[in-house]
Swiss-Prot record:
DNA-binding residues: 130-152, 181-204
Cysteine disulfide links: none
Keyword Transcription regulation appears in the UniProt entry: yes
Annotated protein name in UniProt: Transcription factor MYB105
Tissue: Expressed in organ boundaries.
Originating species: Arabidopsis thaliana
Gene this chain is encoded by: MYB105
Phenotype upon gene inactivation: No visible phenotype under normal growth conditions, but the double mutants lof1 and lof2 exhibit enhanced phenotypes relative to lof1.
InterPro entries assigned: Homeodomain-like_sf (IPR009057), Myb_dom (IPR017930), MYB_TF (IPR050560), SANT/Myb (IPR001005)
Amino acid sequence: MEMVHADVASLSITPCFPSSLSSSSHHHYNQQQHCIMSEDQHHSMDQTTSSDYFSLNIDNAQHLRSYYTSHREEDMNPNLSDYSNCNKKDTTVYRSCGHSSKASVSRGHWRPAEDTKLKELVAVYGPQNWNLIAEKLQGRSGKSCRLRWFNQLDPRINRRAFTEEEEERLMQAHRLYGNKWAMIARLFPGRTDNSVKNHWHVIMARKFREQSSSYRRRKTMVSLKPLINPNPHIFNDFDPTRLALTHLASSDHKQLMLPVPCFPGYDHENESPLMVDMFETQMMVGDYIAWTQEATTFDFLNQTGKSEIFERINEEKKPPFFDFLGLGTV
């Protein structure tokens, strides 16, 4: 038992001697340091230290045993955890009290009375002490006050519509900086970053509408355009003598009405009824010239009278004379 006490005493922390020395070396160390201490005092100190050490360990063991026992009982029977429930309720109340200030902040639309109050507070404290202003303005945070002022209430805001020059600069700035609206807004004095961002989206929506509408117009024109001849060289072989003129319609504009099928190789009988109906539709000469891009071919039709056209066509259609009997012309 004395040996155990001696070993335990070596672990004690005292200001007179280090813990690594034994009881005999303690006495020698104390003589060198001029500490007056008898062997009885050392022995009593060793006993006191060892008893305190064991009592401390016993207390810790009892505390841990009671702690685990109580938690095991709470797990087995939840009704016994009144104390823990009370603590949980207390912490819940504390947390709810800590968040009560955030819950009281209003997040709705700003009312005119609030705008007026904010203007008065900014005039007094300046546009920088937003937390102090929020304390004077019930229900609003400092961030909300700052955003409301710089985006809506600041008298330096430019509320005029964007000009074409500003729109061009905005598109160039966006190509350089991307979606960094605060940096882009610095290039437009009086414009907020929010207004710059919104107008960029307006420009993009407008361009999208224009492109889609022009695409629809082109598609409609292509669907209404007449059938194009797959052999373009046939247009160079245009022969006015093959025109099957059925009638000459006179109008106020004095434009000649011509049928479409007036090209070599056109077979009217072999066409399907749908193609015949489409080709039989009449077409204005001016539109036809624009379609074929051969305006010089039709100049004589606009300059010659109706009777001259008939006479010339009839003369060219006469078959050549062959003297089979050798009698000559009569």
